[in-house]
Amino acid sequence: MPKMVHRSKTRPVRVGDLVIGGNNEVIIQSMTTTKTHDVEATVAEILRLEEAGCQIVRVACPEERDALALAEIKSRINIPLVVDIHFNYKLALMAIEAGVDKIRINPGNIGRREKVEAVVTAAKAKNIPIRIGVNAGSLEKHILEKYGYPTARGMVESALHHIKILEDLDFHDIIVSLKASDVQLALEAYQLASESFDYPLHVGITESGPLRTGSLKSAAGLGAILSRGIGNTVRVSLSADPVEEVKVAKEVLKSFGLAANAATLISCPTCGRIEIDLMAIAAEIEDYIDKIQVNIKVAVLGCAVNGPGEAREADIGIAGARNEGLLFRHGEIIRKVPEATMVEELKKEIDAIVLEKEAEKEAAKASQA
């Protein structure tokens, strides 16, 4: 598997049963598209996100009826619940009382100091962290006047101002995000932030667009940020089904060796040498391994030129030949199979390797107990 990219060490912050920062893995987050007060729809969407591999989910809370739904939602899901709060500090207090795992606020729009202090006091009492969410599109007026337009320095200045509000109240369970729709601006802001404080960073490119273009833009931005060892949680923001956000995030993390429990598919580009329906087989195997939660690399190659030698790092793979397929493990051919059954044979081998790796994980856990 790819070597894990080094991530800048940050202060560990507990969110539910996860720890963000420190030397812990990068966590995938998404956000629901439902009205939060519609409990059935919201829970159903969160369960779909869980199945896709989402590890933390955020919900909007613009109204009191949304806050009143949080306790029931929390009781019916299996991952940490984060609540987005703007302007009304009483909604933050209700969310904390409901037992959510984190709140996302901008201390600058909550109101007077005593309102911020009330939120922080409640969060401290319940050991609930706060994410400070800075957005290039909504910087404070005095910062825009100072810099003329959104800049990385202005975004970090805003973050530091909000951090100080919380630190002055002796609150340190803080996570920070500095989002922009411009990739270069986001990259510069996160780089400067990583040099300015040690709180964990939630990274993403905001308002990145619909599925195809948004995925590409997010991959470019997140890839650049992660390659510098920056980022503790990620969200891919798409104008699409949030399940797609999770899928894209997983692929980005896998590209950097940062997905500890996911399967990776490699497949060759098509050319005139292929003897099998490569595109259909690759798509079928990609779907088959989508929910696997162990480290495994699978290869689907169109001919013997590209495989098995060029995919020797794969745990299991298949290379097409005329009327047959060559099954191989770590570059070594294990057997030939008829073309008609090679996909099913590959799936059987994948299943066997998954069982092996799951047994190894359990044995490792037992040895540490």
Swiss-Prot record:
For whether the record's keyword set contains Transferase, the answer is no
Q: What does this protein do?
A: Converts 2C-methyl-D-erythritol 2,4-cyclodiphosphate (ME-2,4cPP) into 1-hydroxy-2-methyl-2-(E)-butenyl 4-diphosphate.
Q: What is this protein called?
A: 4-hydroxy-3-methylbut-2-en-1-yl diphosphate synthase (flavodoxin)
Which HAMAP family does the entry link to? Answer: IspG
Q: Name one GO molecular function term.
A: 4-hydroxy-3-methylbut-2-enyl-diphosphate synthase activity (flavodoxin)
Provide the species name. Answer: Exiguobacterium sibiricum (strain DSM 17290 / CCUG 55495 / CIP 109462 / JCM 13490 / 255-15)
What PANTHER family does the record point to?
4-HYDROXY-3-METHYLBUT-2-EN-1-YL DIPHOSPHATE SYNTHASE, 4-HYDROXY-3-METHYLBUT-2-EN-1-YL DIPHOSPHATE SYNTHASE (FERREDOXIN), CHLOROPLASTIC
EC class: oxidoreductase
